Swiss-Prot record:
Region (Disordered): 487-512, 580-618
Molecular function (Gene Ontology), one example: ATP hydrolysis activity
Biased composition (Acidic residues): 601-610
Residue numbers bearing the Phosphothreonine modification: T173
HAMAP family: DnaK
Protein's job: Acts as a chaperone.
UniProt keywords, alphabetically: ATP-binding, Chaperone, Nucleotide-binding, Phosphoprotein, Stress response
Natural source organism: Streptomyces coelicolor (strain ATCC BAA-471 / A3(2) / M145)
Biased composition (Basic and acidic residues): 487-505
Full protein name: Chaperone protein DnaK
InterPro entries to which the protein is assigned, alphabetical: ATPase_NBD, Chaperone_DnaK, Heat_shock_70_CS, HSP70_C_sf, HSP70_peptide-bd_sf, Hsp_70_fam
């Protein structure tokens, strides 16, 4: 059975995990790290770079480097590169492809099935877009799971009955969830958050501060210099991390820009107190979702058994202090790595779905109410927020006018009483209603939410049996053929990357062989017969010529030729050595005689192993 992985597709970093003998293991990527930056870059030569390599070259390639694309999921955001449009699903698919590749390399087998996590506050469109990103990357997405739900699964699998508060502050999204665990059931009682608040915003405050300080000191606005801004962003992130463990840090960026007087350098001290002052309003924004969750769940603070911190941003001392203050002095549980816990939970959920993990039932909830617009622009809710999913609810509606031939069903997601103030997810029309006075027709509207949080809406005229259906995807859903096209495109990029890698390897082998052969000829000039030397030099010259071009096949052929003819160097030298030995007569001693056997008898085309050598001499 094919292995299934759990993927935490984060705003700033992503993690992939797999079950090994029933235990979740975080997979180390090709660069040797356990987290992969969610950064995609398009090099000038057309190569797609993902992860650490993309992040490293961002300074010199700002316009062609894309980060934090998760914030655009489910929107019509696009980026145009080399005359080609890329949407958030395609960019995310590049990150997922890398995680898939790293997992395959680690496991030594194909990986197709995956569970991918999303913030609890993601709406329908954002969830659908995440699922599509997985499909474009060539993954069969078994389930889209809320991040705090995954964290609870990783944390609470073998625990007793308890209430857990998950405080998840990542790079770009923030949510708070309250979960009940017991009898193998993980149930999300309430969830709330802000999907435009995260560590990136803390970094941005430091960047703004540095720009302001530099402008007042040098009169130069660094905000207008893209490359300088990129360096500032990296330095701000580093400073934020350092201030989590020390009370002061220095940001030193030489040659940040130049003025008429010459190059300018940035050198600023930043204390933890200053940093906390700069970001105090961001911390304040974390409070409302917390209070909302406690109110929605209808519990007292004293009922919370454990507090779990998720996301690298929770390492900031001010955040940890805030959580302690909000929860009435409760210390957060330190037994979980905040960067990896979500991916671990996703791997466990993949195990549940594959039947590898037993005795766990995962109950998720819908984060926002769902309903339709009725007369007067009112939002009539069919499914209240925090309803456990999968779920199905239906209600009977009627017409507002006499002889109304059709009804328009407009689906909304949100908590406002007026439909227009909520997020519109889609609309469709049920036509062909028979003429009747208003209030007579009976139209049943049913909302059906599947385990991924994707909703299907049906409207049925109970009089005629006419029915109209739609899958609500917030307008972001891509047609199947579009997803297929993008998947093929992603595969094509992967093939191109593979071809580039092969070409680079062939070139490296060729260059290495040229160097080794030329060195050998130089070191053994007097021992190599003239005709052999000429033949080898000719093959080397031909290979050097091919290395100037770009034809990989020709480079490979020329390399093989050099490898073949250079064997004659060794043969010629051994023949000379044997001739010299024969001319000198047999050396005395039994050992010498044993070693002096015919060359062909004693040549083994393999590594020398002591045991074999003894056997051979016996």
């Amino acid at each position: 059975m094919a292995r299934a992985v759990g993927i935490d597709l984060g705003t700033t970093n992503s993690v992939v995990s797999v079950l090994e003998g029933g235990e979740p293991t975080v997979i180390t990527n090709a660069e040797g790290a356990r987290t992969t930056p969610s950064v995609v870059a398009f090099a000038k030569n057309g190569e797609v770079l993902v992860g650490e390599v993309a992040k490293r070259q961002a300074v010199t390639n700002v316009d062609r480097t894309i980060r934090s694309v998760k914030r655009h999921m489910g929107t019509d955001w696009k980026v145009n590169l080399d005359g080609k449009d890329f949407n958030p699903q395609q960019i995310s698919a590049f990150v997922l492809q890398k995680l898939k590749r790293d997992a395959e390399s680690y496991l030594g087998e194909k990986v197709t099935d995956a569970v991918i996590t999303v913030p609890a506050y993601f709406n329908d469109a954002e969830r659908q877009a995440t699922k599509e990103a997985g499909e474009i990357a060539g993954l069969n997405v078994l389930r889209i799971v809320n991040e705090p739900t995954a964290a609870a699964l990783a944390y609470g699998l073998d625990k007793d009955e308890q209430v857990i508060l998950v405080f998840d502050l990542g790079g770009g999204t923030f949510d708070v969830s309250l979960l009940e665990i017991g009898d193998g059931v993980v149930e999300v009682k309430a969830t709330n958050g802000d999907n435009n608040l995260g560590g990136d915003d803390w970094d941005q405050r430091v960047v703004d501060y540095l720009v302001k300080q530099f402008q007042s000191g040098h009169g130069v606005d660094l905000a207008k210099d893209k490359m300088a801004l990129q360096r500032l962003r990296e330095a701000a992130e580093k400073a934020k991390i350092e201030l989590s463990s020390s009370t002061e840090t220095t940001i030193n960026l030489p040659y940040i820009t130049a003025s008429a007087e010459g190059p300018l350098h940035l050198d600023e001290k930043l204390t933890r107190a200053q940093f906390q002052q700069l970001t105090s309003d961001l911390l304040e924004r974390c409070k409302t979702p917390f209070h909302n969750v406690i109110k929605d769940a209808g519990i007292q603070l004293s009922e919370i058994d454990h507090v779990v911190l998720v996301g690298g941003s929770t390492r900031m001392p001010a955040v940890a202090e805030l959580v302690k203050e909000l929860t009435g002095g409760k210390d957060a549980n330190k037994g979980v790595n905040p960067d990896e816990v979500v991916a671990i939970g996703a791997a466990l959920q993949a195990g549940v779905l594959k039947g590898e993990v037993k005795d766990v039932l995962l109950l998720d909830v819908t984060p926002l109410s769902l309903g339709i617009e009725t007369k007067g622009g009112i939002m009539t809710k069919l499914i209240e927020r925090n309803t456990t999913i999968p779920t199905k609810r239906s209600e009977i509606f009627t017409t507002a006018e006499d002889n109304q031939p059709s009804v328009q069903i407009q689906v909304y997601q949100g908590e406002r009483e007026i439909a227009a103030y909520n997020k519109k997810l889609g609309m469709f029309e049920l036509t062909g209603l028979p003429p009747a006075p208003r209030g007579v027709p009976q139209i049943e509207v049913a909302f059906d939410i599947d385990a991924n949080g994707i909703m299907h809406v049906t409207a049925k005229d109970l009089g005629t049996g006419k029915e109209q259906k739609m899958t609500v995807t917030g307008g972001s859903s891509l047609p199947k053929d579009e997803v297929d096209r993008m998947r093929q495109e992603a595969e094509k990029y992967a093939e191109e990357d593979h071809a580039r890698r092969e070409a680079a390897e062939s070139r490296n082998q060729g260059e290495q062989l040229v160097y080794q052969t030329e060195k050998f000829l130089k070191d053994n000039e007097d021992k190599v017969p003239g005709e052999v030397k000429t033949e080898v030099e000719s093959a080397v010259a031909e290979l050097k010529e091919k290395l100037k071009g770009e034809d990989t096949a020709e480079i490979r052929t020329a390399t093989e030729k050099v490898a073949a003819v250079s064997q004659k160097l060794g043969q010629a030298m051994y023949a000379d050595a044997q001739a010299a030995q024969a001319a000198g007569g047999e050396a005395p001693g039994a050992d010498a005689g044993a070693e002096g056997k015919g060359a062909d008898d004693d040549v083994v085309d393999a590594e020398i192993v002591d045991d074999e050598r003894k056997d051979g001499a016996a």
